[in-house]
Amino acid sequence: MKTYNIIKGIFAATVLSVVFSGCSEDAMDRINKDHGHTQSVAARFILTDVITSTAFSNAGGDFNTYLSAYIEYEVGVDNQLYYAETRESEPTSSSTFNNTWNGLYSTLKSARIIINQCSEGGIDHGNYVTKGMAEVLAAYNCALIADMFGDAPCSQAALIDENGSPVYLTPKMDKQEEIYTQAMQYLDDAIADLQKEDLIDPEAQDLLYQGDAEKWLKLAYGLKARYTMHLLKRSANKDADMEKVLEYVNNSFESAEEQAAFDVYDANNINPLYGFFVARAGLGASENMRSKLAEYND
């Protein structure tokens, strides 16, 4: 009888340990999941971030600040802008455009997330206009990469899997020409998508055109004209490409009022170039720029 009770006790303990082990594993599975943050966001909300980072950080950040000195729109008079002005170290320093380099790929990643979510099988499939907006922004950021860095990662960069991890940890280097090809393909796709419909209007999230697909379409054609002109010296048929430029221009903006202006700045949200000037006073008026304006009576 004593032996029976011992065996019974061991069996019960074993069963309980299995039960508690199972419960413990289930509990750990729940604990290990981040329930405090969303796992996915509607594409139209990501759009706001892509527009903002493109305008503020990528087009309006260090590129804008340093290039204004390099092309003599402004003069670097202090600290790093002085070194940029005198070409002592800033043009070749790996840290000069480090922040913008990271920003470009982060923005491109977000644009590609929108495109994937709005494509067939995605959680936002059917929102073709939103997809087209993201394709325009992806093209713009790809072209910034090509213009500023020449050969660079692009086709395999800024791609994530379903878990949010990079698809390629060491993406291949693309030729500058290949990056431009990708940008033009994005614009072709955008032109097709922007002429379709959205299931949900992104008006409130679109900080450029308040959901106006026609204006985004004009922006896409304007960028096609710009990038075709950028490539004219490598063109196999310049006359034909110039005809394309005229065609794209005819489908683009009719006045300055239609330009893609990121017009959200105020006293609390200042333009990054002005913010840099106020914080560091590193830029001064350019004599060359003044002379050109006087020459053209502008």
What are the roles of these predicted feature ranges?
Residues A55, L144, M148-D151, H230-K238:
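Alpha-helix C-terminal capping/termination sites
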Residues C23-E72, Y105, G121:
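Membrane-proximal, proline-rich intrinsically disordered regions
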Residues Q205-E257:
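Aromatic- and glycine-enriched pocket-lining scaffold segments that form the walls
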Residues F45, D239-D298:
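Hydrophobic-face positions in mid-chain alpha helices that act as interaction patches
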Residues M1-S21:
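Sec-dependent bacterial lipoprotein signal peptides
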Residues N79-A152, P166-E197:
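Conserved, well-structured interaction surfaces
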